[in-house]
Amino acid sequence: MPKYRSATTTHGRNMAGARALWRATGVKDEDFGKPIIAVVNSFTQFVPGHVHLKDMGQLVAGEIEKAGGIAKEFNTIAVDDGIAMGHGGMLYSLPSRELIADSVEYMVNAHCADAMVCISNCDKITPGMLMAALRLNIPVIFVSGGPMEAGKTKLSDQILKLDLVDAMIQGADPTVSDEQSEQIERSACPTCGSCSGMFTANSMNCLTEALGLSQPGNGSMLATHADREQLFINAGKRIVDLTKRYYLNDDDTALPRNIANKKAFENAMALDIAMGGSTNTVLHLLAAAKEGDIDFDMDDIDRMSRLIPHLCKVAPSTPKYHMEDVHRAGGVYSILGELDRAGLLHNDTHNILGQTFAESLAEYDIAVTESQAVKDFFRAGPAGIRTTKAFSQSCRWDTLDDDRTNGCIRSKEHAFSQDGGLAVLSGNIAIKGCIVKTAGVDENSLVFSGPAVVFESQDTAVEGILGGKVKSGDVVVIRYEGPKGGPGMQEMLYPTTYLKSIGLGKECALITDGRFSGGTSGLSIGHVSPEAAAGGTIGLVNDGDIINIDIPNRSIELHVDDTELAQRRATADQQGWKPVNRQREVSYALRAYALLATSADQGAIRDKSKLEG
């Protein structure tokens, strides 16, 4: 039977100094011998998705202590991708994921914590904590801050639902008046919480449900709704039970690597494809799997993308539905239920509730549950009141959206498309693959061919797009923006936003070794691997080269003969695979990240071979 890790610091005369310090934090005589549970918070006033988390740590801590544990809270950093976007700050976003994972490892191992509750929400925080959880492999429960309410405003006598991307597009569109742009800006982000569409933050928080590491509703219950408080309370109670199951009952099914195993990762990917999640989730799932020594890679994602239908279409892929609508339709468990009925889910995997998914779906899938409490839980809706306070309203929808023919969530028979919401493409320009969010691609653009217009950075791409260098039918290529080449693998939301603002959103393709915001839609292909800085073919593309994209056949090809490519490669080898005439200040912290970074097909994790003797 494993003993508490914390016993290293709480037992034995030689640990008198450590106990003295524990006492100084409030630990009493009768507490020694209880499990020490880290409450890993991420409160910051910089990020709307985290601005309301200040009191959440102590809410969870109180429940842990009532249930017989010792709770100790600490914070990680949290970067807001929307605020960091469009300038040098975006270089720091993806690297912050590794920093978060490392900081959790440092704190938990330095103080010998026995388990942890991870309070996350936004883009890199949930993935960073997930990587740490699988690296440490101690009992863990995730509970997120919850999504923001969708914005609403009245234009031309119509009530429009809005999100951050609407504000960005309107702000970039020269045909939109200053007054209308400001109206959209003031209405787009009305409350605390992660941005209201199926962007990266909400996608990842939904995926923790499918991985079995969070409770039903974690990804969809609004940050402002009073019902969300119960998720935090239950997390505090359940983590103590989970901890005792492992340490006192020798039950290793309570450990995250046994919950989030290969089958669970396949469930999470199935959910991601079915709900048209952010392409960033692919990057983060690959990275988390590597941390847990789980055999899950791009081949698995490619295989699944050919099997899973697109069952849930949410902003930015449609203006009709936001996360509040997903929740009204039953949230993640309703999507999982539809996948299960289609034979596309491993329902024998377990979760932190101590149930198999078959058991949990019987209780939490609104299509089959007999529980009125569960149905009421999923009727929790928006209040439409601007606020930064959690649990500040108790509004409910009059009815659930249980329409699986024309609703927000659909059955396989009535899917938005039988082809899923994400796809892996490969070819000579992306030998190790690349990712496209097919949920956001116009059906007329699924097969596309055009001449390349090449840019060596996001900044020059924006200048070129706004300066008229891109025309209808072009394939915009933005390279040297990968994990190593950026460094930091910036999001390309501004180039795609500006293409939309000048009427080319459906007229052009964009490919990059960088990545995209969860708010991106259109024919936007990212994560091209290997990246240019690692010798990838994307670094050999010249202006005017024809690129063919065929999403149904999962191919992307540069039409340049092998002899010419070999000559270009020899030249690039001599030049060291560096961008031409790019001026960019890169700090030593980012240079250190770049030295170890792998391409996107590996999740942009560190190259461990460079750290091993």
From Swiss-Prot:
EC number, UniProt record: 4.2.1.9
Record's keyword annotation contains Heme: no
EC primary class: lyase
Pathway(s) served: Amino-acid biosynthesis; L-isoleucine biosynthesis; L-isoleucine from 2-oxobutanoate: step 3/4; Amino-acid biosynthesis; L-valine biosynthesis; L-valine from pyruvate: step 3/4
Disulfide bridge map: none
Signal peptide residues on this chain, from the entry's feature table: none
Cofactor(s) essential for the protein: [2Fe-2S] cluster; Mg(2+)
Keywords assigned: 2Fe-2S, Amino-acid biosynthesis, Branched-chain amino acid biosynthesis, Iron, Iron-sulfur, Lyase, Magnesium, Metal-binding
SUPFAM superfamilies, A to Z: IlvD/EDD N-terminal domain-like (SSF143975), LeuD/IlvD-like (SSF52016)
Any single Pfam family the record assigns to this protein: ILVD_EDD_N
Modified residues (N6-carboxylysine): 124
Binding site for [2Fe-2S] cluster: 122, 195
GO function terms (MF aspect): 2 iron, 2 sulfur cluster binding; dihydroxy-acid dehydratase activity; magnesium ion binding
BP-aspect Gene Ontology terms: isoleucine biosynthetic process; L-valine biosynthetic process
Location of the active site: 517
Entry function: Functions in the biosynthesis of branched-chain amino acids. Catalyzes the dehydration of (2R,3R)-2,3-dihydroxy-3-methylpentanoate (2,3-dihydroxy-3-methylvalerate) into 2-oxo-3-methylpentanoate (2-oxo-3-methylvalerate) and of (2R)-2,3-dihydroxy-3-methylbutanoate (2,3-dihydroxyisovalerate) into 2-oxo-3-methylbutanoate (2-oxoisovalerate), the penultimate precursor to L-isoleucine and L-valine, respectively.
PANTHER family the UniProt entry points to: D-XYLONATE DEHYDRATASE, D-XYLONATE DEHYDRATASE YAGF-RELATED
Assembly, per entry: Homodimer.
Protein name: Dihydroxy-acid dehydratase
